[in-house]
Amino acid sequence: MATFKAKARAVELLGKGQIADLPTAITELWKNGYDAYAKNLNCKLYLDSYKDNQSPVFLLSDDGFGMSETDINDKWFVLGTDSKARGEKINPAFGLKRRIPMGEKGIGRLSVSYLGPQMLMLTKKKGETANAFLMDWRILDNYNFFLEDLNIPLFAFDSVREFIKKLNESKNSFQTNLKSDNWKEQGKSK
């Protein structure tokens, strides 16, 4: 019996590789905010003079529903999800009318890789703790790496102090991807 496998670089091919330019990348991400019933979608660029940063910081934010840990694991990290196509129900407590979804294929979120080499996602669903994860898209440059071998630390937090502590732990944990046996010189196979 044969099965499909996906190299980690497939994420880059479906994300950054499918995006023509910066406005397209932002539009794809704003579609996700719209589909999350956001009333406000914001885009800000902080140049390298911002808080002693060595690189510019590009911030996209919305005030949509947010995601729980389950949502992140079962939707955000699952390529080609069909939750929008199935027309998931809106919690009536929000008092919102159903919107026609803008995103359709379940891969638009990957356009974030076009914006820069690293991404920090912070999200909070009403009534739940906040969640975050850090992704360094450069890890996908490893042609020997399979998606199932990629370790992306996801953590919950309730305070700024806890966030900073867990973010530092998350950075160290993400670096275990670099120690993997799969991280070899380009051109050499596993």
Regions found by a protein language model. Name each.
Residues 1-190:
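GHKL (Bergerat-fold) ATPase N-terminal catalytic module, capturing the glycine-rich phosphate-binding loop
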